Amino acid sequence: MVHRLPTGPGETGGVSDQGFLHAAGPTPVAAFPADAELPVDVVVYGPDIPDESSLRLLGPTEGKRILVLGAGRGHTAVALASQGAHVIVVDAHDDRLEAARDLADANEVKLELHHGDLAELAFVRADTIDAALSVHELGRLDDLDRVLRQVNRILRTGSALVCSLPHPASLMLDDSEPGPPRVVRPYADRAARAVGDDRIHPRTIAEVFSSFGRANFRVDTVLEPPVQHDEPSPFWTETMTLVPATLVVRGRKDGV
């Protein structure tokens, strides 16, 4: 069942699509997971990088209550449910929730699906979630701090939020034309970028780290995973060999 919650206020701010809307060729990494065919037995944090079986950021998940922020097409949630977790998914897009439900049905697992803004988590009691996970979704948020505060409220003390985001260095570059990638924006430029139907809000690593700290998370892991070359995904570009495409962060809820 999909539970409907009130959506949050609309996002504001300018949008630029410079360097991110490819007329043809690879899918922009910032659009991940888009319609990519992903496994349903392991969590994938981004295109062409090691997955949870290598990174081991979540720990044992069987019997755990895990919040997934952003449904994607359901692969992350189904992978966790297949491992025995009770998975709660929040997303503001009906089509993504329906895709997650269809994938769960096809794999004979259950998901608890909620429609609403990622910061509207009042339906979850405080200190009841064992882990939270977001794959390339928090980069689409204008107000990251608000979401992190709400996630911190519902996590048990010591429990982790693991998230992946488009790496800010990769968002500086445009590789849509032949030849070397071009730098099209400063590293610290916060202007939103249009990527397909989404908007990406670039943040430096320092800004992400500070947002976690303000929400009472202790960051214990920051990863810039190297790309893997064995089976390139639809997101693959040579630029991924020059700068990291995905940033992965884990923060644990500190005690009061």
Regions found by a protein language model. Name each.
Residues 1-62, 75-79, 103-107, 160-191:
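Conserved class I S-adenosyl-L-methionine
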